[in-house]
């Protein structure tokens, strides 16, 4: 076979040296003057043999071939690019044919199974098949379970009168092994609906039903069918985006300007000159552009990172504080040779800042993965205009993503570019205006920092749980440590969804931001089963994020802010380190004055990095905790996550200017933004309806907590602006 190659090097692709942009920017006269020729049979034969040995030759190999064959190095480079593209197309056609045949086979089997189900009969009772709508059956079973619990409580009360002692109720959890915690742990007193404190199980008012809001039209859909006409268009958009991202990753000035001594900000004027656009994207005066670049070293190899980036479930777990929702809508290409090289996915994604004051950003985008050279991968995201996509936020993602380069000892260097155009339909709250307008809240540095912290967390799994930093050797096995970390990860994800303004959480806004900035939502939870209220607010403190983090994570200072502890001391009885910073850990806490009649403990994870910190906790039953510590699946352990996220307020650069007062009542000196979120079980009845008394109670709870934190950290004269 032969390829037509221009003498001027204007073949397909641009290797990051600007060849592709010259091809597009050249005038009609220049294109007519370019001369083309075909390679000789001997040249092609030599190139083919070299391609079989190494499809990705380096510069030294390309120069050697250039001397042997009498061709320019650029011609060698473009020949290999074209050959790889042709080989990829051949593999894709073969894969598509095989997938189509397999799809036809599965479709026939599906039809046969559906027909068989229509005539299915239960072998035990001879009855008809199950209902086609399991929702009502599930609700009926939950109501029956609630009645059975009431009957059990009534019978236990009657039996206790005759036996002269209380009868312990049956545990709803599976049998478990005895843990060392059994001998050392009691529980917190006065922990609300989990102990003997004030209950939120009120008489529910009729007519105040809580309807679950529908998800986004794309988020709730199954995989979309992409036509054969659209696939080449998507592939072309992805390849163009990859070329642009490579230029942005590899070029410094004048495209990028260094600010704050460490952040790279895109020079929009230079960008428009290098990447002129025929559309109005990036030119609308009503839109604001945020573009930044950052890099860092992470403790994970490139292939493992690529695997996580191309899996939406793992992607969401990797960035729980940034990604509110992520779903693969269609797989246009699954990659080559069992890897993600050439993989192209169509995604729905929603980005968040952990605060009820900041709206989320929704994107329908293409994610493309390509190996640039041995040990180096590029993952690019770019918005795609899909007719079915109706966005609540007018946001567009220009070519963004990262370059991942393998380094020795299992490390990788990650260089990240984030380039977003957004329209602010509502005025950004003054607390977050600075960090959002400066591109910090959704910027590249936050992505890299979060990735570094999460990779460090994953790496801690290889550290034995009985290290000197663990207390008492409670976590005895690697399986137990892994199970505890999975439980804590689910707790964090649950908390992040409860405090953000995601459009895709299955919840109802009960009370929008009131006069003190508290937002209350309600949803039906499977674990624990029932109706859950979520309340969240954000407030400012003049203290540094690290000081606030140290105060909130320390069990010795917990009674100063934890309303539900009733001022009782708390002690740490188990500890798992999951990072180099001493504050990055998972803890199990108990009340020092608790009695053995209440077996409720507190599971807590704290984490800090340069972008911020969080302290998240949840009451957990002792029996359930034993399940996790024995290494069993913790997926069904009930969790009601509460906690705090702490981030810089973005005014660090102003701290030397005297801290002039602003209209919000807070000084412009560096401080912290704290988001506090509580989740409380209102009722264990699946058909429960909500009353306003429970909303008022949770508002009072969160308001009291905020006041006590401000009093403890800022003193009586501190700012009270929320």
Swiss-Prot record:
The UniProt keywords, alphabetically, are:
Coiled coil, DNA-binding, Homeobox, Nucleus, Transcription, Transcription regulation
Q: Which SUPFAM superfamilies match?
A: Bet v1-like, Homeodomain-like
Q: What is its main location?
A: nucleus
Coiled coil where?
81-161
Task: Give the matching InterPro entries.
Answer: GLABRA2/ANL2/PDF2/ATML1-like, HD, Homeobox_CS, Homeodomain-like_sf, START-like_dom_sf, START_lipid-bd_dom
Composition bias type Basic and acidic residues, residue spans: 20-31
Instruction: Explain what the UniProt record notes about the effect of disrupting the gene for this protein.
Output: Plants show excess branching of trichomes. In plants missing HDG3, HDG7, HDG11, PDF2 and ATML1, increased cell division leading to cell overproliferation.
Q: From the Swiss-Prot or TrEMBL record, state where the protein is found.
A: Nucleus
START domain segment(s) = 227-460
GO cellular component, as recorded: nucleus
Q: Name one GO biological process term.
A: plant-type cell wall loosening
Q: Which residues bind DNA?
A: 32-91
What is the top-level taxon of the source organism? Eukaryota
- Name the family the entry cites: Belongs to the HD-ZIP homeobox family. Class IV subfamily.
PANTHER family tied to this protein: HOMEOBOX-LEUCINE ZIPPER PROTEIN HDG11, HOMEOBOX-LEUCINE ZIPPER PROTEIN MERISTEM L1
Query: What is the additional note?
Result: The gain-of-function mutant edt1 (T-DNA tagging) exhibit enhanced drought tolerance, increased root system development, reduced leaf stomatal density, increased levels of abscisic acid and prolamine, increased resistance to oxidative stress and high levels of superoxide dismutase.
Q: What does this protein do?
A: Transcription factor which acts as a positive regulator of drought stress tolerance. Can transactivate CIPK3, NCED3 and ERECTA. Transactivates several cell-wall-loosening protein genes by directly binding to HD motifs in their promoters. These target genes play important roles in coordinating cell-wall extensibility with root development and growth. Transactivates CYP74A/AOS, AOC3, OPR3 and 4CLL5/OPCL1 genes by directly binding to HD motifs in their promoters.
The protein, known as = Homeobox-leucine zipper protein HDG11
Native organism is Arabidopsis thaliana
């Amino acid at each position: 076979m032969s390829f037509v190659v221009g003498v001027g090097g204007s073949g397909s692709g641009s290797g990051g040296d600007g060849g592709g942009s010259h091809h597009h920017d050249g005038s009609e006269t220049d294109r007519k003057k370019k001369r083309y020729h075909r390679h000789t049979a001997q040249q092609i034969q030599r190139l083919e043999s070299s391609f079989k040995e190494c499809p990705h030759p380096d510069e030294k190999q390309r120069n050697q071939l250039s001397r042997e064959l009498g061709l320019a190095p650029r011609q060698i480079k473009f020949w290999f690019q074209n050959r790889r593209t042709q080989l990829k197309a051949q593999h894709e056609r073969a894969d598509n044919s095989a997938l189509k045949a397999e799809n036809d086979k599965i479709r026939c089997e599906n039809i046969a199974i559906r027909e068989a189900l229509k005539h299915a009969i239960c072998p035990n009772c001879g009855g008809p098949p199950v209902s086609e709508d399991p929702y009502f059956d599930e609700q009926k079973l939950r109501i029956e379970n609630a009645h059975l619990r009431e009957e059990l409580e009534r019978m236990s009360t009657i039996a206790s009168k005759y036996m002269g002692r209380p009868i312990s109720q049956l545990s709803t959890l599976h049998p478990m092994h005895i843990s060392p915690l059994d001998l050392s742990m009691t529980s917190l007193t006065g922990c609300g609906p989990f102990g003997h404190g004030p209950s939120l199980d009120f008489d529910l008012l009729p007519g105040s039903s809580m309807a679950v809001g529908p998800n986004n039209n794309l988020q709730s859909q199954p995989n979309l069918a992409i036509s054969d006409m659209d696939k080449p268009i998507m592939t072309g958009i992805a390849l163009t985006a990859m070329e642009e991202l490579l230029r942005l990753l590899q070029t410094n000035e004048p495209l990028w300007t260094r600010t704050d001594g460490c952040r790279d900000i895109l020079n929009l004027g230079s960008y428009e000159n290098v990447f002129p656009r025929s559309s109005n994207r990036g030119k609308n005066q009503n839109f604001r552009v945020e573009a930044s670049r950052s890099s860092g070293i992470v403790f994970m190899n490139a292939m493992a990172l690529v695997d996580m980036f191309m899996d939406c479930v793992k992607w969401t777990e990797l960035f729980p504080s940034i990604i509110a929702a992520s779903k693969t809508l269609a797989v246009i290409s699954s990659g080559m040779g069992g890897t993600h090289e050439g993989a192209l996915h169509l995604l729905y994604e929603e980005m968040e800042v952990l605060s009820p004051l900041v709206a989320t950003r929704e994107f329908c985008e293409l994610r493309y993965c390509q190996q640039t050279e041995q040990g180096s991968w590029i993952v690019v995201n770019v918005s795609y205009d899909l007719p079915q996509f109706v966005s609540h936020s007018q946001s567009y993602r220009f070519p963004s993503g990262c370059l991942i380069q393998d380094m020795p000892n299992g490390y990788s260097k990650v260089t990240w570019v984030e380039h977003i155009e957004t329209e602010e339909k509502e005025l950004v709250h003054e607390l977050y205006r600075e960090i959002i307008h400066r591109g910090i809240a959704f910027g590249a540095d936050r992505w890299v920092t979060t990735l570094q912290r999460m990779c460090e967390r994953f790496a801690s799994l290889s550290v034995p749980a009985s290290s000197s930093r663990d207390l008492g050797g409670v976590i005895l096995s690697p399986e137990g440590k892994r199970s505890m970390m999975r439980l804590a990860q689910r707790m964090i994800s649950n908390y992040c969804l409860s405090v953000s303004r995601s459009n895709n959480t299955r919840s109802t806004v009960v009370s929008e931001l009131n006069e003190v900035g508290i937002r209350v939502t309600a949803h039906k939870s499977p674990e624990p089963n029932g109706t859950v209220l979520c309340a969240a607010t954000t407030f400012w403190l003049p203290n540094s994020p690290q000081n606030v983090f140290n105060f909130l994570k320390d069990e010795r200072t917990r009674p100063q802010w934890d309303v539900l502890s009733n001022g009782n001391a708390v002690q740490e009885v188990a500890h798992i380190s999951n990072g180099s910073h001493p504050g990055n850990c998972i803890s199990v806490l108990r009340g020092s004055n608790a009695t053995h009649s209440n077996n409720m403990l507190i599971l807590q994870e704290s984490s800090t990095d340069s972008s911020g910190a969080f302290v998240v906790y949840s009451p957990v039953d002792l029996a359930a905790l034993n399940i996790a510590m024995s290494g069993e699946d913790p997926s069904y352990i009930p969790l009601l996550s509460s906690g705090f996220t702490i981030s810089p307020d973005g005014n660090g650069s102003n701290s030397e200017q005297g801290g002039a007062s602003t209209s919000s009542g807070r000084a412009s000196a560096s401080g912290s933004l704290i988001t506090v979120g509580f989740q409380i079980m209102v009722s264990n009845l699946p058909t429960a309806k909500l009353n306003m008394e429970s909303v008022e109670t949770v508002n009072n709870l969160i308001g009291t907590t905020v006041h006590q934190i401000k009093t403890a950290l800022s003193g009586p004269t501190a700012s009270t602006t929320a």
